[in-house]
Amino acid sequence: MKAYSVILGIVAACTAFSSAWARPATHSEWDNDDADSTVAVIAWFNKRDTMTYWINESSWKVKDGDTTKTSGVSTKVMLTVTDSTKKGYNMEYKFLDFQGDTLADSKIGEFQNTLVNKLSKDIVGTSIRFRTDEYGHITKYENLKEIKTQAKELFDSAYEELLKQPVMDSLKSVGIDITTLIKKADIATIVDGYTEELEMMFRFHGNSFTVGEYDDHSDETKKEYASDSHLSIDLDPETMEYSISTTVETKIPSKDIKELVGYIVETFSDDSKSEDFSDEYDKQVKEDAIVSSWNSWKYFADGWPSEVLSQTETMLMGQGKLKQTFIAWETRSVGNPEK
Protein backbone atom coordinates (compact mmCIF):
# COMPACT_ATOMS: atom_id res chain seq x y z
CA MET A 1 0.00 0.00 0.00
CA LYS A 2 1.44 3.37 -0.95
CA ALA A 3 1.99 5.69 2.01
CA TYR A 4 0.33 8.71 0.42
CA SER A 5 -2.86 6.76 -0.29
CA VAL A 6 -3.30 6.17 3.43
CA ILE A 7 -3.04 9.78 4.52
CA LEU A 8 -5.18 11.71 2.04
CA GLY A 9 -8.42 11.29 3.95
CA ILE A 10 -6.79 12.31 7.21
CA VAL A 11 -5.35 15.49 5.72
CA ALA A 12 -8.71 16.41 4.19
CA ALA A 13 -10.47 15.97 7.52
CA CYS A 14 -7.97 18.23 9.25
CA THR A 15 -8.33 21.09 6.74
CA ALA A 16 -11.92 20.86 5.52
CA PHE A 17 -12.91 24.17 7.10
CA SER A 18 -9.67 26.09 6.66
CA SER A 19 -11.66 28.86 4.92
CA ALA A 20 -13.37 29.69 8.21
CA TRP A 21 -10.44 31.89 9.30
CA ALA A 22 -9.55 33.15 5.82
CA ARG A 23 -12.54 35.41 5.15
CA PRO A 24 -11.45 38.93 4.19
CA ALA A 25 -13.81 41.92 4.25
CA THR A 26 -16.29 40.48 6.77
CA HIS A 27 -18.05 43.09 8.92
CA SER A 28 -21.34 43.74 10.75
CA GLU A 29 -23.32 46.79 9.63
CA TRP A 30 -27.09 47.14 9.73
CA ASP A 31 -27.58 50.71 8.50
CA ASN A 32 -26.54 50.62 4.86
CA ASP A 33 -26.40 53.97 3.08
CA ASP A 34 -25.79 52.31 -0.27
CA ALA A 35 -27.93 49.19 -0.67
CA ASP A 36 -26.39 48.49 -4.08
CA SER A 37 -22.92 48.01 -2.61
CA THR A 38 -23.72 46.03 0.55
CA VAL A 39 -25.50 42.76 1.25
CA ALA A 40 -26.70 41.92 4.75
CA VAL A 41 -27.51 38.29 5.50
CA ILE A 42 -30.69 38.83 7.50
CA ALA A 43 -33.65 36.50 8.04
CA TRP A 44 -36.95 38.09 7.05
CA PHE A 45 -38.96 35.02 8.05
CA ASN A 46 -42.59 34.53 9.06
CA LYS A 47 -44.28 32.00 11.29
CA ARG A 48 -45.22 28.88 9.29
CA ASP A 49 -42.57 29.50 6.59
CA THR A 50 -41.34 26.14 5.29
CA MET A 51 -38.41 25.15 3.07
CA THR A 52 -37.30 21.66 2.04
CA TYR A 53 -33.77 20.86 0.87
CA TRP A 54 -31.75 17.96 -0.47
CA ILE A 55 -28.29 17.58 1.06
CA ASN A 56 -25.99 15.62 -1.26
CA GLU A 57 -22.69 14.40 0.19
CA SER A 58 -20.20 12.80 -2.19
CA SER A 59 -16.55 11.84 -2.42
CA TRP A 60 -14.30 10.97 -5.34
CA LYS A 61 -10.87 9.45 -5.80
CA VAL A 62 -8.63 11.57 -8.04
CA LYS A 63 -5.68 10.14 -9.97
CA ASP A 64 -3.84 11.68 -12.92
CA GLY A 65 -6.78 13.97 -13.68
CA ASP A 66 -9.41 11.20 -13.62
CA THR A 67 -12.09 10.99 -10.92
CA THR A 68 -13.95 7.94 -9.61
CA LYS A 69 -16.91 8.36 -7.29
CA THR A 70 -16.35 6.39 -4.09
CA SER A 71 -19.33 7.30 -1.91
CA GLY A 72 -22.52 9.31 -1.87
CA VAL A 73 -25.60 9.81 0.27
CA SER A 74 -28.54 12.22 -0.04
CA THR A 75 -30.64 13.54 2.81
CA LYS A 76 -33.94 15.40 2.54
CA VAL A 77 -34.68 17.89 5.32
CA MET A 78 -37.39 20.41 6.13
CA LEU A 79 -36.96 23.76 7.89
CA THR A 80 -40.03 25.30 9.50
CA VAL A 81 -40.51 28.55 11.43
CA THR A 82 -42.66 27.58 14.40
CA ASP A 83 -42.74 31.05 15.98
CA SER A 84 -41.63 34.57 15.12
CA THR A 85 -41.00 37.36 17.64
CA LYS A 86 -39.14 40.69 17.73
CA LYS A 87 -36.20 38.91 19.35
CA GLY A 88 -35.91 36.10 16.84
CA TYR A 89 -37.32 32.85 15.53
CA ASN A 90 -38.13 29.41 16.89
CA MET A 91 -37.43 26.83 14.20
CA GLU A 92 -37.49 23.10 13.49
CA TYR A 93 -35.09 21.05 11.35
CA LYS A 94 -36.59 17.66 10.42
CA PHE A 95 -35.03 14.69 8.60
CA LEU A 96 -37.44 13.41 5.92
CA ASP A 97 -35.56 10.88 3.79
CA PHE A 98 -32.18 9.25 3.14
CA GLN A 99 -30.88 7.72 -0.09
CA GLY A 100 -27.63 5.90 -0.79
CA ASP A 101 -25.72 6.11 -4.07
CA THR A 102 -25.65 2.87 -6.06
CA LEU A 103 -23.10 4.34 -8.49
CA ALA A 104 -20.42 4.78 -5.84
CA ASP A 105 -17.59 2.37 -6.66
CA SER A 106 -15.72 1.46 -3.48
CA LYS A 107 -15.92 -0.60 -0.31
CA ILE A 108 -16.58 2.62 1.58
CA GLY A 109 -19.52 3.38 -0.70
CA GLU A 110 -20.93 -0.11 -0.20
CA PHE A 111 -20.59 0.19 3.57
CA GLN A 112 -22.21 3.62 3.54
CA ASN A 113 -25.17 2.29 1.57
CA THR A 114 -25.50 -0.56 4.07
CA LEU A 115 -25.68 1.95 6.93
CA VAL A 116 -28.21 4.11 5.09
CA ASN A 117 -30.49 1.12 4.53
CA LYS A 118 -30.14 -0.09 8.10
CA LEU A 119 -30.20 3.13 10.12
CA SER A 120 -32.20 5.66 8.11
CA LYS A 121 -35.54 4.38 9.40
CA ASP A 122 -34.44 5.34 12.91
CA ILE A 123 -33.56 8.90 11.89
CA VAL A 124 -36.43 9.78 9.54
CA GLY A 125 -38.86 11.98 11.47
CA THR A 126 -36.24 13.18 13.94
CA SER A 127 -36.50 16.93 14.55
CA ILE A 128 -33.98 19.37 15.97
CA ARG A 129 -35.56 22.43 17.59
CA PHE A 130 -33.50 25.60 17.71
CA ARG A 131 -33.66 29.36 18.16
CA THR A 132 -32.13 32.24 16.24
CA ASP A 133 -31.77 35.94 16.96
CA GLU A 134 -33.62 38.54 14.90
CA TYR A 135 -31.05 38.26 12.12
CA GLY A 136 -31.24 34.46 11.80
CA HIS A 137 -28.03 33.62 13.67
CA ILE A 138 -28.46 30.32 15.55
CA THR A 139 -28.26 30.97 19.30
CA LYS A 140 -29.54 27.80 20.97
CA TYR A 141 -30.53 24.17 20.37
CA GLU A 142 -33.50 23.04 22.45
CA ASN A 143 -33.39 19.22 22.38
CA LEU A 144 -29.77 18.13 21.93
CA LYS A 145 -30.07 15.81 24.94
CA GLU A 146 -32.55 13.67 22.99
CA ILE A 147 -30.36 13.85 19.89
CA LYS A 148 -27.32 12.77 21.92
CA THR A 149 -29.15 9.64 23.09
CA GLN A 150 -30.16 8.74 19.54
CA ALA A 151 -26.66 9.47 18.20
CA LYS A 152 -25.09 7.10 20.73
CA GLU A 153 -27.49 4.29 19.78
CA LEU A 154 -26.86 4.80 16.05
CA PHE A 155 -23.10 4.94 16.56
CA ASP A 156 -23.19 1.63 18.42
CA SER A 157 -25.21 0.07 15.58
CA ALA A 158 -22.79 1.42 12.98
CA TYR A 159 -19.83 0.10 14.98
CA GLU A 160 -21.37 -3.38 15.11
CA GLU A 161 -21.90 -3.26 11.34
CA LEU A 162 -18.30 -2.14 10.80
CA LEU A 163 -16.96 -5.12 12.74
CA LYS A 164 -18.69 -7.41 10.23
CA GLN A 165 -16.80 -5.92 7.28
CA PRO A 166 -14.03 -8.09 5.73
CA VAL A 167 -11.64 -5.14 5.73
CA MET A 168 -11.43 -5.32 9.53
CA ASP A 169 -9.86 -8.79 9.37
CA SER A 170 -7.51 -7.62 6.63
CA LEU A 171 -6.30 -4.73 8.78
CA LYS A 172 -5.78 -6.96 11.80
CA SER A 173 -3.76 -9.41 9.72
CA VAL A 174 -1.15 -6.70 9.10
CA GLY A 175 -1.08 -5.52 12.71
CA ILE A 176 -3.55 -2.63 12.51
CA ASP A 177 -6.47 -2.47 14.94
CA ILE A 178 -8.64 0.62 14.46
CA THR A 179 -11.19 -0.44 17.08
CA THR A 180 -9.05 1.34 19.69
CA LEU A 181 -9.45 4.59 17.80
CA ILE A 182 -13.18 4.07 17.24
CA LYS A 183 -13.84 3.39 20.91
CA LYS A 184 -12.37 6.80 21.71
CA ALA A 185 -14.91 8.56 19.49
CA ASP A 186 -16.33 11.71 21.06
CA ILE A 187 -20.13 11.55 21.18
CA ALA A 188 -20.26 15.36 20.99
CA THR A 189 -18.56 15.18 17.60
CA ILE A 190 -21.14 12.63 16.45
CA VAL A 191 -23.96 14.93 17.57
CA ASP A 192 -22.35 17.73 15.57
CA GLY A 193 -22.97 15.56 12.51
CA TYR A 194 -26.71 16.14 12.98
CA THR A 195 -26.32 19.93 12.85
CA GLU A 196 -23.32 20.37 10.53
CA GLU A 197 -25.30 21.22 7.38
CA LEU A 198 -27.80 23.32 9.35
CA GLU A 199 -24.89 25.38 10.68
CA MET A 200 -23.59 25.73 7.12
CA MET A 201 -26.90 27.15 5.91
CA PHE A 202 -27.07 29.77 8.66
CA ARG A 203 -23.34 30.41 8.92
CA PHE A 204 -23.38 34.05 7.77
CA HIS A 205 -26.70 35.24 9.18
CA GLY A 206 -25.96 38.32 11.25
CA ASN A 207 -23.14 39.55 8.99
CA SER A 208 -22.94 42.04 6.14
CA PHE A 209 -20.53 42.26 3.22
CA THR A 210 -19.44 44.84 0.69
CA VAL A 211 -20.15 43.76 -2.88
CA GLY A 212 -16.97 43.01 -4.81
CA GLU A 213 -13.98 40.73 -5.27
CA TYR A 214 -11.25 40.38 -2.65
CA ASP A 215 -7.92 38.54 -2.54
CA ASP A 216 -5.90 37.78 0.56
CA HIS A 217 -2.70 35.99 1.54
CA SER A 218 -2.03 34.62 5.01
CA ASP A 219 1.50 33.77 6.05
CA GLU A 220 2.24 30.63 8.01
CA THR A 221 1.95 30.92 11.79
CA LYS A 222 2.31 28.47 14.66
CA LYS A 223 -1.39 27.60 14.34
CA GLU A 224 -2.10 28.02 10.63
CA TYR A 225 -0.50 27.13 7.30
CA ALA A 226 0.15 29.73 4.62
CA SER A 227 -2.79 30.16 2.27
CA ASP A 228 -4.18 32.24 -0.57
CA SER A 229 -7.87 33.06 -0.58
CA HIS A 230 -10.44 34.81 -2.76
CA LEU A 231 -13.81 36.18 -1.65
CA SER A 232 -16.62 37.16 -4.02
CA ILE A 233 -19.82 38.99 -2.98
CA ASP A 234 -22.57 39.39 -5.60
CA LEU A 235 -25.98 41.08 -5.51
CA ASP A 236 -28.72 40.92 -8.17
CA PRO A 237 -30.28 44.42 -8.17
CA GLU A 238 -33.49 43.17 -9.78
CA THR A 239 -34.32 40.23 -7.50
CA MET A 240 -32.16 41.34 -4.52
CA GLU A 241 -30.90 37.76 -4.30
CA TYR A 242 -27.25 37.55 -3.32
CA SER A 243 -24.32 35.16 -3.02
CA ILE A 244 -21.07 34.69 -1.13
CA SER A 245 -18.27 32.50 -2.45
CA THR A 246 -14.75 31.74 -1.25
CA THR A 247 -11.78 29.78 -2.54
CA VAL A 248 -8.79 28.90 -0.38
CA GLU A 249 -5.60 27.09 -1.35
CA THR A 250 -3.36 25.80 1.43
CA LYS A 251 0.01 24.09 1.18
CA ILE A 252 0.81 21.53 3.89
CA PRO A 253 4.50 20.61 4.23
CA SER A 254 5.34 16.95 3.72
CA LYS A 255 7.14 16.78 7.08
CA ASP A 256 3.99 17.87 8.93
CA ILE A 257 1.89 15.23 7.20
CA LYS A 258 4.44 12.59 8.15
CA GLU A 259 4.34 13.69 11.79
CA LEU A 260 0.53 13.71 11.91
CA VAL A 261 -0.01 10.36 10.25
CA GLY A 262 2.93 8.79 12.07
CA TYR A 263 1.21 9.58 15.36
CA ILE A 264 -2.02 7.95 14.17
CA VAL A 265 -0.18 4.87 12.91
CA GLU A 266 1.48 4.50 16.32
CA THR A 267 -1.92 4.69 17.99
CA PHE A 268 -3.25 1.47 16.47
CA SER A 269 -0.24 -0.54 15.30
CA ASP A 270 2.97 -1.95 16.70
CA ASP A 271 6.45 -0.37 16.53
CA SER A 272 7.52 -2.35 13.47
CA LYS A 273 4.59 -1.03 11.44
CA SER A 274 5.44 2.53 12.53
CA GLU A 275 9.01 2.07 11.31
CA ASP A 276 7.79 0.59 8.01
CA PHE A 277 5.49 3.57 7.50
CA SER A 278 8.29 6.05 8.15
CA ASP A 279 10.64 4.35 5.69
CA GLU A 280 7.98 4.05 2.97
CA TYR A 281 6.91 7.65 3.43
CA ASP A 282 10.44 8.99 2.98
CA LYS A 283 10.90 6.89 -0.16
CA GLN A 284 7.66 7.85 -1.86
CA VAL A 285 6.52 11.28 -0.71
CA LYS A 286 8.66 14.03 -2.21
CA GLU A 287 6.13 16.87 -2.40
CA ASP A 288 3.90 18.95 -0.16
CA ALA A 289 0.13 18.41 -0.09
CA ILE A 290 -2.17 21.00 -1.67
CA VAL A 291 -5.63 21.47 -0.15
CA SER A 292 -8.07 23.50 -2.28
CA SER A 293 -11.43 24.52 -0.81
CA TRP A 294 -14.41 26.01 -2.62
CA ASN A 295 -17.41 27.28 -0.65
CA SER A 296 -20.46 29.20 -1.81
CA TRP A 297 -23.79 30.36 -0.41
CA LYS A 298 -26.76 31.65 -2.43
CA TYR A 299 -29.72 33.37 -0.76
CA PHE A 300 -33.22 34.50 -1.62
CA ALA A 301 -33.94 38.16 -0.87
CA ASP A 302 -35.68 37.17 2.38
CA GLY A 303 -32.54 35.48 3.73
CA TRP A 304 -33.52 31.87 3.11
CA PRO A 305 -30.57 29.90 1.66
CA SER A 306 -31.22 28.59 -1.84
CA GLU A 307 -27.92 26.72 -2.39
CA VAL A 308 -24.86 25.92 -0.31
CA LEU A 309 -21.71 24.25 -1.63
CA SER A 310 -18.68 23.08 0.34
CA GLN A 311 -15.96 21.25 -1.58
CA THR A 312 -12.43 20.24 -0.62
CA GLU A 313 -9.79 18.63 -2.81
CA THR A 314 -6.62 17.22 -1.26
CA MET A 315 -3.81 16.33 -3.66
CA LEU A 316 -0.48 14.64 -2.95
CA MET A 317 1.93 13.16 -5.49
CA GLY A 318 -0.56 13.28 -8.37
CA GLN A 319 -3.48 11.67 -6.60
CA GLY A 320 -5.97 12.64 -3.97
CA LYS A 321 -9.53 12.88 -2.74
CA LEU A 322 -12.40 15.24 -3.44
CA LYS A 323 -15.23 15.69 -0.94
CA GLN A 324 -18.35 17.72 -1.60
CA THR A 325 -21.50 18.75 0.24
CA PHE A 326 -24.15 20.36 -1.95
CA ILE A 327 -27.42 21.66 -0.48
CA ALA A 328 -30.23 22.77 -2.81
CA TRP A 329 -33.79 23.86 -2.07
CA GLU A 330 -36.67 21.75 -3.41
CA THR A 331 -39.91 23.34 -2.14
CA ARG A 332 -40.59 26.79 -0.74
CA SER A 333 -43.65 28.07 1.12
CA VAL A 334 -43.08 31.51 2.66
CA GLY A 335 -45.07 34.58 3.62
CA ASN A 336 -47.95 32.49 4.91
CA PRO A 337 -50.63 34.48 6.77
CA GLU A 338 -50.88 34.07 10.52
CA LYS A 339 -53.71 31.90 11.84
Please state what every model-predicted region is.
Residues 1-30:
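Bacterial Sec-dependent N-terminal signal peptides
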Residues 23-339:
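Signature of exported/secreted
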